Amino acid sequence: MKHLHSITELSNDEIMHTIERAIMIKNGEIKRYENIYTANLFFENSTRTKCSFEMAERKLGLQVIPFETSTSSVTKGESLYDTCKTLESIGCDVLVIRHPENNYYEQLHELNIPVVNGGDGSGQHPTQCLLDLMTIYEEYGKFEGLKIIICGDILNSRVARSNYHALTSLGAQVKFVAPEIWQDHSLDAEYVSIDDAIEEVDVCMLLRVQHERHDEDAANFSRVNYNRMYGLTRERYDRLKEEAIILHPAPVNRDVEIDSELVEAPKSRIFKQMENGVYTRMSILSQVIENNR
């Protein structure tokens, strides 16, 4: 792994290597790096991904260059490429970027330093996908044959897209649950009712309703109706298999995608995902650093 733009760039072996390395790091096998400089360029708001990357970088001994888009020359019209080329020129070794434009990284092929994608529009979120995979693998020790539903705003979700590609490649059976207006038929997955699927799934992955990516739909959105038709309610939770787990990339709209009381219920792994995000990103960054030396 010399960079990470999309989960589709990785073979199954590379995915498994990244997960296994993350588990080793979690168990205390941490290699620290000297004189490696990184910058995190987040052009969309973020709590988990941005802080998780910074924690991963600091645990690896990396020097993190502060960068805030609101006080940078981006506000003066500087292009993404020129911003990144500037950071390369002053000595950054790795860039982590989140950007609202799908496939923004295609503008950056002339850079001589690696880019790790922290999320591009509704395109890809490879590091979130890999931490989700790590969390599933810790529970089941496999992907082959697992039954997984991904519930919510599929059309606007980079998390759904990345997870669908990786999980199906690894042998899991993935189905979607979504209102018709938020379905994405470019992904060759079956759409089902949550009530028809809930009793047989091994993993119930919930997605945030992304109000900021909607227009006229937002005015017609009903939290109560969404929760009733598509959300994980207590009644649905009680129908899950004993060993089933719940995932959510967060932030969580409580009482919309999931009843508030279930966010930290025994089957929930939502905060475990956040913990694993640090180890997964340490695994990714260490591979990128070592493969670009």
Swiss-Prot record:
Q: Which domain of life is it from?
A: Bacteria
Task: List its EC numbers.
Answer: 2.1.3.2
User: Broadest EC class?
Assistant: transferase
SUPFAM superfamilies this protein is in? Aspartate/ornithine carbamoyltransferase (SSF53671)
Q: Which residues cross the membrane?
A: none
Give, as in the UniProt entry, the pathway in which the protein acts: Pyrimidine metabolism; UMP biosynthesis via de novo pathway; (S)-dihydroorotate from bicarbonate: step 2/3
Q: Where is the signal peptide?
A: none
Q: Which Pfam families does this one have?
A: OTCace, OTCace_N
Reaction(s) catalysed (UniProt annotation): carbamoyl phosphate + L-aspartate = N-carbamoyl-L-aspartate + phosphate + H(+)
Q: Name one GO biological process term.
A: amino acid metabolic process
Record-annotated residues binding carbamoyl phosphate? R48, T49, R98, H125, Q128, A250, P251
Record: residues binding L-aspartate: K76, R158, R208
Q: Which UniProt keywords apply?
A: Pyrimidine biosynthesis, Transferase
Which GO CC annotations does the UniProt entry carry? cytosol
An example of a GO molecular function for this protein is: amino acid binding
Q: Which PANTHER family match?
A: ASPARTATE CARBAMOYLTRANSFERASE, ORNITHINE CARBAMOYLTRANSFERASE, MITOCHONDRIAL
Q: Which family, according to the similarity comment?
A: Belongs to the aspartate/ornithine carbamoyltransferase superfamily. ATCase family.
Subunit structure, interactors included = Heterododecamer (2C3:3R2) of six catalytic PyrB chains organized as two trimers (C3), and six regulatory PyrI chains organized as three dimers (R2).
Q: What does this protein do?
A: Catalyzes the condensation of carbamoyl phosphate and aspartate to form carbamoyl aspartate and inorganic phosphate, the committed step in the de novo pyrimidine nucleotide biosynthesis pathway.
Name of the protein this chain belongs to: Aspartate carbamoyltransferase catalytic subunit
**Species per Swiss-Prot/TrEMBL record:** Macrococcus caseolyticus (strain JCSC5402)
